[in-house]
Structures are given as C-alpha cells and as structure tokens.
C-alpha cells in the first residue's frame, strides 16, 4: 500500500476511487509505478502486458500480488484431499494447512475418512468424531489469518453418508462456530437418485439404509436431505458437491493417477491431494465489437489468438512458482499435472452490450456456445504448447476418451494434432469468483449477474467524511444512454432455475468447476431449496451454493440507510418490557474454594437479567433450567423441578452483591454485548472480586450465542455473497482473495 497516487493507474481505472484502492492496497508492491507494476505482473511478456492494459485479462490475486517479489505463492488455493483416520495424519494436515496459509494459499480438505463419534479407538475408547478436528482446523485458519496479509481460507467437506453428517449440517446454526471455513456436503448419485425417487412418489420419507461395519448405523436420506435444505435456507451452508460429476467430468476422467478428492475453498477447482490452482480470468466484455447496436458480436478471432497467450503465460507461472509452494508434495503434483485455472468474468456486461437479458433463453445459448469455443481453443492452445515444450508428465492418451473431450465438436485435423502432440496441461478452465479483480475493473464478476447496478459507498474508508454517495456501474450508464435499459436485471430479478441453467450452460465446457451463488429472496422456503438442489443435480452441476436474503445475518444493502451509522452516533435504547415469567438457567459455580449460585433469566434465549449470591451452605445441585416469576416489585421467585427460591432478592449477603448483579442486569436489558459487560466486570477488585468472577464465568457461556453481522474486516461494511464468496462493495475486500 502506498499513499502516493499513481496518476497513470488512476486513469487506467477510469478515475474510480474504489478500483484504485483495490489496486493500491492489494496488488501494488512497495509504491511501484503503474508501468513497473505492469512489467512485474506480466513477467515482461509483451502480449500479456497488452491484454492487461486493454483490460482483457488479469491474473488471479496471488499472482498479481506476489509475482516478481519472491515473497509467497502465486497460486490462490490448494487441496489436502482426504484426511486419513489417524492422529498422525490429522495433525500433519493441520501443520500443512498452516504452512500453506503462510505461503498465502487457501486449503480444501475432506473429513470423510475420519471415524465418527462413538467409534472405538483401539477397542478401548470412543472417538469424539469429526467436530473437535473441525474446530482445530478452524482455529488454525483463524490464527494464521491474524499474522498474514492474506487471510486463511478453508473448505471442509464431508460425505453425506457419514454417520456425523447431521452434526456437520447443523454446526453452522451457531454463527460463531466454524466461522473461518466454508462447508460442503459430498453427495453421490445414489443419494440423489433416492431423493428423486421420493419426489416422484416411489418411496416414503422414512426410507432407511443400514450400514454395518466397525460401527453400525442407519441413514434416512430423505430426512437428512430436508435437514440440509432447511439449514442452507437459514444459514447459507453447507453447500453441496455432486461427487460423481465433480470427480469424473474432466479431461482426466480415465487417468488412474489423477484422483480428485475435494475442492479449493471457493469450489471452482476440484483437486487431487496436494493439488494447486493457478487462477486467471479473461474479461469477455472487452471482446464485444459494435456494442449497443444490432450488429454487436463477439470477436472470436481475437479471443482465439489471445487464448494461446493466456495458456502460455499460465504455463510459465507453474514453473515460476515451484520454489514458493509450502510443501514438496504440492511442488510434485504441480510438476506432474500442470493444472491451469483459466476463467472468465464480465459475462453480464458482455450480454448487456449485445442487448441480451441475463437468464433468458438467448443468454443461455450464447454462454453455452461461447464456453464451447473457449474450452476447445484452450485445449488446442495447450496442445500447441505441448508441441513446443512437451506433454505434462502425467499425460495419458485416455484423455481423448473423456466425456467432456468428446462433447466438443472437433475437426478431424484437430483430433490428429492433439493425438500427435498431446497436452501441456491436465486442466484448463476454472471460473473463480473474481471478487477483487472484477470489482477493480468495475465489471460483473465471473459468470454472475450484477448484484446491484448502483450502491451507496461510505466515504469514511477513503477520507474522514461520514457521508455516503451513490455509485453507478459504468455498464448501466452506457445501457441507459443507448436505450438498453431492458437488459439491466440484477441477481434478485433472476429465478433460481435461470441461475442454474446459466451455470449448467457454462459447466458443460468447463473441465474443472464454477464458483457461483444462487441468490434467492427472503421469503424462500426450505421446500424450494429442496427443488433447487435436485434441479442442479439433474442439470449436471458439480456443486451448488445458495444464498437466501437475510440468512447468516444481512448481506450488503443497496439502499442508503435512513439512520446515521450506529458506530459513530450515541443512541439511547429502551429495554423490552419484562414478562411475568422468564425461562432461566441455574448454575452453581466454584471459585477459589467458594461456591456461588448464579441464575440467568432469558428472553428469546438471550440473557435478560441475572441474580447471584455466595452460598453459605454448599449445594449439591447440577446446572438446570427453571423459571423466574415476578411476583411484585422487588419480589422474584425461582422455581424448577429441583428447588424453589421464594425471593431471589433476599439471598444477597450484602449490598455489594446486590449492586454487582443489578448493574449487569440493566446492561443486559438494554442490549449491551456480553463481552463488554464481562470486560468491565473483570476490572472489579477488592471484597467482591470472587463474586464478580463467578458471574463472568457464567456470562461467558452465552458469548458464543451472540450473533454479529457478517461485516468486512477491512472497512466494517456489510458483505455480499456472490459466486460462493463474500465480498465488500465498499472497499473491494474479497474473502476469496
């Protein structure tokens, strides 16, 4: 980051402050000039330098940030594959992901081989299952995030037939648990066929499959599927990975040495164990000639020529990055298979320039034909490069038998050329979120539609003002100018079937995968989500992520708030009226040899009031639930199946105890976050230090239940979910880099 404004870069980005901030804060190295930046990230390649300057192409975030600096990896993401069911391997994976984060890469791993909770360890002890290890991997991701300029990114997946699938589905219902990882369920054809049979009336909801082995258990697929859809509707996770399509629909389908195990964090790269993805994206909107006219069309000749330069440049990155992988195994896999991840962005802008409405039948046809062209010519470019540089070491002629290869319309001469030269790369296309680079160019990201064509930007992150101003996407202004308003649909205007059909059209000719989010309205029901996942599977998607508006607490708003920013204004609050009865939690706490009773009254499952006192006689009572009944002012009765306390206020031993419970109760009622109450109470010393410590210990049990909005770690604004990834429209931050 540099405070010196580079005028050339500012002009290149059309004077857009947000775009410039992204370039300056994320991709500029030590205040370098725009010309030096262009030279560094292009590696001196004149054609790539031209494509970047023309905004037709950009490398992925890690390459833009790190190329030529010698600092860290040029690859965005990696895969650890299956975590084996041994303590040694589990701990090794934890170390490996930490080292990968240090190198600025993300990680994906599958928990499917880890024995479930209750399974025996050495015929003596029962396993605690996957959850403790999920927590460990999450903590590692969080801790490395604190010490790096790039935040750790993690995907954990689990086979839906695993005994702990239900726990896996439910775990994110607590928004503070596993908050540094994306979760996806691995779902095979057998499971989805059962779901399809159910909706066709062939089987009932109680249909059960029994597993007998080291541990026996029953799976009820229909009920499990409904639970999955309910939680996806409420919490936007887990996502789903359709494993038969994910692992087999690629060029390496019949190559035994190449076994896909899971994906990178955003899901656009199914990878083998220790696989890596180098990412880049072509801005298709810049290939439209005669835009906003009846003669608009894609310049296929230019696109074909440029595709070779892109494949060549990405192949260079593989060799250049070998010294920067965190693990030798990652280096070995990169050398053997030479994976590429060439993606696209600006699809929606492209369609607008051609007068085509995103999601329409025509748009689906255009995207399908376009991706067929891109994939075919990427293969031909890789084959041409193989003729110059040699085949990738893991090449096998069985590639020509793969389903996706044979879906391409080939000329006889083209097939002959590929047979003769082979391929330089095992994978070619991968459509990533492009949250940061797409926002930097001020275009639609990946294959997503625009979330909003205008939004309010808080200028506080740019200067020290407290005002917002409305920002319009340049494409929208152009569309209005030329009378193309009918093309200005947003993600909210597009049905879930249209979202899926667009993704399916592209997926047919993307040999890895696509990161995309199906945005759905607030009133969406779990029953609708059930139909979404089924349709996505039937249409051949490799994975599916949904986002119901309002789930996981708010996404970014495209409406200006009528209220001042609450973080900058002092606001008085009014406590909700206390009902006669409150549910309550009863605790006995031992602290420094003394026993205390703490009773917490709950309103809507959140602490509303607290009563506490030191016990003169030690109680032998377990923690339990009861009720606090307000009999009259200064008379609060506690009742449960274990005991009755006629008046809680008469239990205080002194005025200090009464005061020490009165004040936190007032703070709770007025909505003060528990963590701040605890922080303040810990400052108390003297005669009642042990008493307040006991209260703090109880209150800390509720901090994990406090739900906070998902906000940008850079500027504090709300995030939007797009292409399976959280990004900020205010400062350009993207969770996926």
What are these regions (language model features)?
Residues 1-74, 81, 225-227, 234, ...:
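Acidic/polar, glycine-rich intrinsically disordered N-terminal extensions of enzymes
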Residues 260-263, 267-270, 315-322, 404, ...:
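Catalytic alpha/beta core of large soluble enzyme barrels
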Residues 4-14, 75-300, 323-333, 378, ...:
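Active-site cavity-forming subdomains of large catalytic enzyme subunits
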Residues 712-715, 728:
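Short cysteine-rich clusters marking metal-coordination/redox-active sites
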Residues 206, 212-214, 306-331, 357-434, ...:
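Internal maturation/activation junctions in enzymes
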Residues 66-78, 86-110, 157-160, 164-165, ...:
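Conserved phosphate/anionic-ligand binding catalytic regions in large, soluble enzymes, centered on
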Residues 52, 56-67, 160, 311-322, ...:
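Core structural elements
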Residues 559-601:
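Short, Gly/Pro- and small/polar-rich lid/capping loops
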